[in-house]
């Protein structure tokens, strides 16, 4: 049964008014005997839950209230909770696929609502995306962003050039249409091309359009490490966008990625708290893994090398002077990630390298890790699990009241199907970083 989060919170008072104890009532499904943890932060309590259609219509003592169910689920010894909301997924493709539209990797974790088109991606025709899901049906509730990277790519292509006034107006129009068609805000992936080519001012102009339609700003930061402006600079940039565009901001998969920024969690938290005191609405999500998920290209290539797309990259590689510069900067980026052994191929069309680390691939190919990485990129790239975070930073972010859990799920990384179980097992029941009500 898929029920919305908001409805569960609203239902108890209204349900009890609608169903006095002396009047028997029948529900479709009665979940009986469980411990209800309702998401408000309150301690769990014994309560039965009655569902009719797609609504929760009763929360309380079913026997005392004479509530019976056409179907009864015995939940003694189990926790009953609202369906989880995952604020950061990459489920757009799955929901549009006839064989995967049920979204089982999420439903099986207890996730009943997903947000998607994060990281500045997804289609620009939001109306068509939502209409397709409505027509064909999907397994979870879903909400979508309009991706700034997709918007920029649609108007400017893969160029790093600044938009002309006319092009900027065109991008504004795309965002406005998407918001009118049902997007809840604008997402950015300022670490990824082509979104990374936008200046802060350019992003602010598009965010203002989302704000005018009541939307929020969701961002994969421009830098979660020390690639360009640094983690602290990137957090400050996101806060500036919220301040100047006048909209709430949400930082995706908040983290300190790589040894250069390990230990900066406290400073990041202080920046966010300062912005909140200023009146800016700031929230974040994270996944409970020390390995991030990205591509070989995004891990190793400097941002300038991505301008113009794959064909332009091939031309740069073919030029001896440019190649020398490229390889040198890729070496630095590999060290930021923790070295070649920290990059595990998690999804690729080349099955010969699937499940292998980049250092082992380099040995098998009799070349250096950077050259092996460049070969993979030019052959179409591959997804990697990148082991680059410390538990101490993860836990400091986790306990903040503005941080929720989001999977950032992608093929090949266990976070797509294991984020919420891992959070409960590892950080609630084993390490006691969080309590169950939290």
PLM region spans:
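Histidine-rich, glycine-flanked metal-binding segment
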Residues: 23-28, 36-83
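Charged helix-capping and loop-helix junction motifs
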Residues: 99-101, 200-205, 232-237, 266-268, ...
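Active-site neighborhoods of metal-dependent hydrolases
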Residues: 145-146, 150, 154-165, 169-193, ...
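Short, ordered loop/turn segments at secondary-structure junctions
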Residues: 62, 119-120, 189-191, 221-223, ...
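Divalent-metal coordination cores built from histidine and acidic residues
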Residues: 75-80, 84-91, 95-188, 207-208, ...
